[in-house]
Amino acid sequence: MEGSSNSPDRQSSGGSPPEERGGGGSGGGGGRSAAGEPVRSRWTPKPEQILILESIFNSGMVNPPKDETVRIRKLLERFGAVGDANVFYWFQNRRSRSRRRQRQMQAAAAAAAAAASSSSPSANTSPAAASAATVQVGLPPVAVVHTMAMGGSACQYEQQASSSSSSGSTGGSSLGLFAHGAGASGAGGYLQASCGASASASSALAPGLMGDVVDSGGSDDLFAISRQMGFVGSPRCSPASSPATPSSAATAAQQQFYSCQLPAATITVFINGVPMEMPRGPIDLRAMFGQDVMLVHSTGALLPVNDYGILMQSLQIGESYFLVARPT
């Protein structure tokens, strides 16, 4: 039979039963496969079917129940013959490969951590000092730039220790801060602003850092990609503060800079499993991908286009789509 030669590490074995000695393929599916389904040769999924299966698996559905297996099988049948048992065994073998890779990564991480701890010259380094960022070139020696994550983007926090009370500057400073390291003037679409804001003003900005996340679909969308990717549609602001300058001559100076990014004119979607930046609004599908392709949503719905190859509906942020060849 076919079970003795299967291996979870091979992609082509995704639709065949896992290793079974003498198994005839009738009871190895735990009741998942159809009772009247005949024994067949090894199923080799097509590239389009692999992309759909991987997208569903990566979205969190690693062990679909019987009714969902039927829905997935109907979706895969658009690109070739497939049975319920093939879908069930593909997910079973895919879980085995995922667990094996996870064990290998954990072992490698443990070995690297052990090697790093044994070769460390000093054990007195505090976690805060170990996570400190590099000193920015061109700034005074006491100016340090820290990197932190806000709203899915890298923001920089600049702190300058200034014990001198004679510097009366409270607003505009000559220290240029570009949150994402934009070197050229005007490049990247960033605004530069400096203001002496209080702690309450900076805390008021915190609720708006994540912006209005576009919610397309919902719990009923079976194959929607997870929204936990940090993509937002509103501007991201990154506070960078320095010690304050009160009227007292003995305290330090504080300056806060806010580098805000203009709203992006593109959205991030997944096409054939690859994240891509696509423009908002109508898209010329024919000019972008060619004349003999169609765009299919991960749920199996075909996106309509007009006679000129323009999509008649806008793509949704974070959703997964597939480019397939137009049948001849």
Curated annotation (Swiss-Prot):
Pfam families: Homeodomain (PF00046). Its main location: nucleus. It comes from the Eukaryota. One of its GO terms (biological process) is adventitious root development. SMART domains: HOX (SM00389). Residues 38-102 bind DNA. InterPro entries: HD, Homeodomain-like_sf, WOX11-like. Transcription factor which may be involved in developmental processes. One of its GO terms (molecular function) is DNA binding. It is found in: Nucleus. Residues 1-45 are annotated as: Disordered. Residues 23-33 have a biased composition (Gly residues). Keywords: Developmental protein, DNA-binding, Homeobox, Nucleus, Transcription, Transcription regulation. Signal peptide: none annotated. This is WUSCHEL-related homeobox 6. Belongs to the WUS homeobox family. GO terms for cellular component: nucleus. Residues 1-11 have a biased composition (Polar residues).
